Amino acid sequence: MASRKLRFAIFGNTYQPKKSVSIQKLLACLSVRQAEVIIEREFYTFLTDGQRLPIEGVSIFDQSDFNADFVVSMGGDGTFLRAASMVGAKQIPILGVNTGRLGFLADVKAQEIERTIDALYEGDYTVDTRAVIKVETDGQPLKGYSCALNDVAILKRDNASMITIHATVNGDYLTTYQADGLVMSTPTGSTAYSLSNGGPIIVPGTHVFSLTAVAPHSLNVRPIVFSEDCEIKLTVESRTHNYLVALDGRSENLPETTRLTLRKAPYRVKVIKRAGTKYFHTLREKMMWGADQRG
C-alpha cells in the first residue's frame, strides 16, 4: 500500500543482549523494503560497540530530535514508555516488539517481526489512541518530560514514615491520604503499578483515570475512578519535607512546598495494533487467567 519510502525510528533498551537477533531481523526486513532507518544514538552505540553488530545504511538521532512515519520500540513495556516520552506530541504511531518480559504494550513477538512489518506496508493494522497524564507544578519545575502514558506516582522517600496527601478533584476536596504514596493511572497503566496496589483494571479506550493509594493507613481507603477531563490537585506533607514524583518510572525529588496539578495532556499516544489483536485475549494471556499451574 505504501508508495513512498517510509522512515522508521528505532528505540531499544541497552541491557538485553538477546535482542541483537531481533534487531538484525528487523533491519533486514526494512532493508528489503528500502525503508529509511534511524536509530537512537544510545541504542546504536549499544548495538555496535556492546554487541559489535555490523549496522550500515542507517542514521542516528538523539532522544526526541527526530521525525518518522513509524516508531519501533525493541524491548519491554519500559522501553515502549520511554519511546512514547520521546515521541511526545509528534503523533507518530509506535510499534512495540517484545524482547522483554510481560509486554502489554510491546506485544509483537520477535518471530512475528517480518509479517508485522509487511502488515504495516499493506495497511493491515489499527491504531489505538491512548490518553496521557500531564503534570504541572506551582514551584520547582520538573526536570524531565512532564507527561506519563502509564501513571504518575507520588511517593515517600528516605524515611519509614508515611506521607500525607491532600487531594481535590475539580476544586472539590476529595480526601486526605495517609499512605506510602498515591498512584494516578491511565487505562493503559492500570495493569502496572496501580494494579499491584489493588487498583482496577481499566479497558483502554475508557475515558477515565484512577487514583489508588499505596499502602494506606486506613482500610477504608479505596481506589476511585473519575473522568479523564477532571483536574486533580495534590498537596503533600512529609516529615522529610520532600517527596518523590515518578512519571512512568522517571523519578525526581520535590520539596513538599511544591503542589501538583494532574490533568489529561492535550494529545494522545498512538499505539499500533496488528489486525485481529484482541485486548481481552492479551489480558487473559498476560495475567494467566484460567491457567492451571499445578503441573
Residue ranges of model-derived segments:
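ATP/NTP phosphate-donor binding region
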Residues: M1-F70, Q111-T126, T137-S146
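Short glycine-rich anion-binding loops that position phosphate/pyrophosphate groups of nucleotides
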Residues: Y15, D77-T79, L102, T188-S190
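Short glycine/serine/threonine-rich phosphate/pyrophosphate-binding segments
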Residues: K19-S20, G78-A83, T191-S196
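Short gly/pro/ser/thr-enriched loop/turn and capping motifs at secondary-structure boundaries
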Residues: F46, G100-L105, I201-I202, S218-L219
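ATP/nucleoside-binding phosphotransfer catalytic cores, i.e., glycine-rich phosphate-binding loops
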Residues: I154, N170-Y173, L219-G295
